[in-house]
Amino acid sequence: MTIKANYDSAKQAYEKWGIDVEEALRQLEQVPISIHCWQGDDIEGFEVNKGELSGGIDVTGNYPGKAQTPEELRRDLEKALSLIPGKHRVNLHAIYAETNREAVERDELKPQHFENWVKWAKNLGLGLDFNPTLFSHEKAADGLTLSHPDPDIREFWIRHCIACRRIGEYFGKELGTPCLTNIWIPDGYKDIPSDRLTPRKRLKESLDRIFSEEISEQHNLDSIESKLFGLGSESYVVGSHEFYLAYALTNHKLCLLDTGHFHPTETVSNKISSMLLYTDKLALHVSRPVRWDSDHVVVLDDELREIALEIVRNHALEKVAIGLDFFDASINRVAAWTIGTRNMIKALLYALLLPNGYLKQLQEEGRYTERLALMEEFKTYPFGAIWDSYCEQMGVPVKEAWLYDIKEYEQQVLLKRKASSPIV
C-alpha cells in the first residue's frame, strides 16, 4: 500500500472515535521544539580560552565528525533540521559566541558576538533560545557560582547572566519571537552541608539582581532550572526544585523542568498538571536519564508519551516551551539530534490522536476498566501511518529513509573533518 492509502485507512480508524486527524496535524505543525546546539560538539563551545567540561556534566564517546567551528556546527544543525518535520528553534549556550579569535570574558559578551547565529536563524526562519554558561570556567572550579561566598566571583556570574539576558532580548527583537533565556547553575556540595540556608539566600539575592533590569517578555522570557544532584554535588544542590519553584511563582518567571534532574522514581509528566494550575507558562528540557542524569538521546518510551499527553490533554501546547537536552558522543551526532527530535514530535502526535475527552469522561464516571483497555488498545492504533504521511507532507524522509541521508553526510562531510581528542 502507498503512504496515502495507509494514511486514509488509519484516518478512518481514528475518525471512528471522533478524532480529526487533519486538525491534529495542523496543531502539530505549530509546535516548535527547541533543539540544543551542544549535542553537535560535546558542549565544547568556541571560547578562545576553553575550560574543561565541568559542573557535574559528562559526555562519553569519541564518534568521528564532531563540529569544531561555528560553520561546521551550523551546517550539521541544518542537516538535522532537513530531516525533522516542522519549523523549530535552536538553543545556544553563551560559550557558542563568535569573538573573532579575541578572548572575551563571559561577563563582557554582547549581541555582536552572536550576529552570525542571528543571520543564520533569520535565513532559515528559526527562533533562538539562550543559556548563560556557568560551568567549564576557572571561576566555577570549586562548583559555586551565583551562590559563591566570594562576592567578586558572585558578581562576575551576575554580570554574565545580565549580559545573557540582553543577548536573549536581542535574539527576540531580531527574530520576532521571544527568546527563552534559561539559568542553570552547578552550585552544590559533595558532602553534607553545615548550612543550607546561606547559599540559597545568596542565590536569591543574585537572581534578584539579575532580573532587576526590565526586559519585555515580547523579546525575552526568563526561566530557572533546578537539579536534584550532580557529580560533585551529591549531598546538596543550592538551586533545588523547591527553591526555583517558589522563586518562579513569586517573581513571575518560568520554572524549567529537566526530565533528568529529579530522582529516578520521579516523573516530570506527573508535575506538569500541578504546575499549569499555578503558572501561565512553563518550560521543559526533555532528556533520557538512565539511572542518573545521563542525558541519553530521547527515545519514544512511556515517559515521553506521558509528557506529551499531559501537554495535549491539558490544552497546553502554547503554554509549555519544549526544549531538548541530551548529548551522546558515542553515535553520529547529527543522527542523535534527528532521532531525539523526531521522537519528541512523534510523542506529541501520538497524544493528539487519542480520544482524550472520552478517556477523561471514563475516569470521571469511574469506568476504570474501559479507561485502561482503551489506553492500551490505542498503543497499537496505526499512528505510524499518520506520522509517515506527515513527514511526506513536510518534505522530510519517511520512516528510516533519513538514515541513508545521514550515512551519506557522514561519508561526504563528517569523516573528512580533522580528528579531535577523545572525551571520556
Swiss-Prot record:
It catalyses: L-rhamnopyranose = L-rhamnulose. One of its GO terms (molecular function) is L-rhamnose isomerase activity. SUPFAM superfamilies: Xylose isomerase-like (SSF51658). Keywords: Cytoplasm, Isomerase, Manganese, Metal-binding, Rhamnose metabolism. It is found in: Cytoplasm. Mn(2+) binds at H261, D293, D295. Its EC number is 5.3.1.14. Binds 1 Mn(2+) ion per subunit. Disulfide bonds: none annotated. Its cofactor is Mn(2+). InterPro entries: L-rhamnose_isomerase, Rhamnose_isomerase, Xyl_isomerase-like_sf. One of its GO terms (cellular component) is cytoplasm. The keyword Acetylation does not apply. GO terms for biological process: L-lyxose metabolic process; rhamnose catabolic process. Pathway: Carbohydrate degradation; L-rhamnose degradation; glycerone phosphate from L-rhamnose: step 1/3. Catalyzes the interconversion of L-rhamnose and L-rhamnulose. HAMAP family: RhaA. Belongs to the rhamnose isomerase family. This is L-rhamnose isomerase.
